[in-house]
Amino acid sequence: MNHIRNFSIIAHIDHGKSTLADRLIQRCGGLQEREMEAQVLDSMDIEKERGITIKAQTASLKYKAQNGQIYNLNLIDTPGHVDFSYEVSRSLSACEGALLVVDASQGVEAQTVANCYTALDLGVEVVPVLNKMDLPNADPDNAKIEIEDVIGIDATDAIACSAKTGMGIDEILEAVVARMPPPRGNPAGALRAMIVDSWFDTYVGVVMLVRVVDGRLAKGERIKMMATGTTYNADSLGVFTPANEPRESLEAGEVGYIIAGIRELQAAKVGDTITLIKAGTGGAAFTATEPLPGFKEIQPQVFAGLYPTEASEYESLRDSLEKLKLNDSSLRYQPEVSQALGFGFRCGFLGLLHMEIVQERLEREFDQDLITTAPSVEYQVVQADGTVKMVENPSKMPDQGRLDEVREPIVTVHLYMPQDYVGAVMTLANQKRGVQMNMAYHGRQVMLTYEMPLAEIVMDFFDKLKSVSRGYASMDYEFKEYRAADVVKVDILLNGDKVDALSIIVHRSQSQYRGRAVVSKMREIISRQMYDVAIQAAIGSNVIARETIKAMRKNVIAKCYGGDISRKHKLLDKQKEGKKRMKQIGSVSVPQEAFLAILQVDA
């Protein structure tokens, strides 16, 4: 076990994590030259295009150190984005060390800090690396100061490297061997292996990526998941070098994969502990009683409705979501019906990036045409009789009279930006009902800490943050608590009928403004009818905004010329009567753009 090192790479988006991983794989001869393509570990197209890592991947590398010994290095790739923080914490808890990669030209960014704190909390040895040293504007001294200031780890012997040119790669590998501890664990104890990641393969079912902590697992043995209690046969084992290499057994300290004929991803939950079941006398000694710490069920935070543009596509959308869920266990969905949009699904996501990626994968990999409703968050509603109910769909919110209080999710937001943009970012955060908790200067960077309602972030906070800071600000957030808030449901009515898909939940202080904005936008979109159409925004029975689309009408008195006024009145009254009858039986169709209009109303 002393010759095994498990490590991962922590970096902000675009700081060169995947390129560095490629270089390390190449240096250790993990792939032949011809198989070496850019970003070997990012296997999804969307990962390569957006330059982000979504799922954790691994590579087991053999490295001959300068002292002549051969070491087994297991590189566990981690996602860098804040939405995937649970996957990051699982990847990191499988490691003893981490390379903290910082772009020498840009310095420390928000998600680096968030993930680095996770690593330090888990007791992982962090080795700082300054990447992109080949750039003319690299400023290693400033980057070192920022690492020490913001993260608080010693950066005097940070390794300078450039993943692009290959400079400093050997120094990194030596540091992994010298500065990171070997795995801790009991090779002779009962088997305990943690699932770091799992994905679905069409030929063999679910593939689980595991880190064996104690004991050993041989091919063909019976394994048990401790969170769900289900048992399976370990049909095949192996390691990734990134290509897969079958093995007869996995020992304590190793990272490898297990294929056990599992059909659905729900059974292999990320972070769960696997142990052995052995029959016969003394078999109990092989079964662990205590699972590994840190496992938790992932809870979605952002909800939106997904509807097919054609009602006949509903079944194929369901199939697509089922297939997508095989590879993305954090996606939640359930069928829902809307009067305006027909049949569709209410989906739960980890965050906005996760929502975008799911939408994009549905459209790209499954050819779906989708309508997405405005994203909303889950509210805790305390009803008048004292029962607490979770509401994530605005149209399911009970009436004001039956409510005691509504609690909304509050998150702690960390914002990092250069000093020049502090004023603009603070103004934006205050508009979004943020409460400033802290402000700290680190060299040229400033870190602001706010408490904000998640509902304000999911609408368009990230886009606005980027625009007021010209793209320099970065953010990450974590859930804090539910807190009582004065939020109301604004319904949109057409001729007195509610349109369920257009309901929104907003803070009372913004309800007038948002209601008026939606109503005036709707007036532009809905076409004129033969009778007046009243568009109203209402809170309960209290109308807060109204616009009227005037009827198209024929000039019925054009043929009269002179003549008696009573004759004209008779014709006008007859027309009025006809319009009234029409209005009773007519219905207004809501065009597609109306639902998108809600998204575009600036808060």
UniProtKB/Swiss-Prot annotation:
The record's listing under Pfam families reads: EFG_C, GTP_EFTU, GTP_EFTU_D2, LepA_C
What GO cellular component is one of the record's annotations? plasma membrane
What GO biological process terms does the UniProt entry carry, in alphabetical order?
Answer: positive regulation of translation
Residue ranges of the TM segments:
none
Top-level taxon in the UniProt lineage? Bacteria
Domain (tr-type G): give its ranges. Answer: 2-184
List the PROSITE patterns.
G_TR_1, G_TR_2
**MF terms (GO), sorted A to Z:** GTP binding; GTPase activity; guanosine tetraphosphate binding; ribosome binding; translation elongation factor activity
Keyword match Membrane: yes
Alphabetically sorted, this entry's keywords are: Cell inner membrane, Cell membrane, GTP-binding, Hydrolase, Membrane, Nucleotide-binding, Protein biosynthesis
Chief location: membrane
HAMAP family for this protein: LepA
Q: What does this protein do?
A: Required for accurate and efficient protein synthesis under certain stress conditions. May act as a fidelity factor of the translation reaction, by catalyzing a one-codon backward translocation of tRNAs on improperly translocated ribosomes. Back-translocation proceeds from a post-translocation (POST) complex to a pre-translocation (PRE) complex, thus giving elongation factor G a second chance to translocate the tRNAs correctly. Binds to ribosomes in a GTP-dependent manner.
Family statement drawn from the similarity comment of this UniProt entry: Belongs to the TRAFAC class translation factor GTPase superfamily. Classic translation factor GTPase family. LepA subfamily.
Name recorded for this polypeptide = Elongation factor 4
Please report the organism this UniProt entry assigns to the protein: Albidiferax ferrireducens (strain ATCC BAA-621 / DSM 15236 / T118)
UniProt gene name? lepA
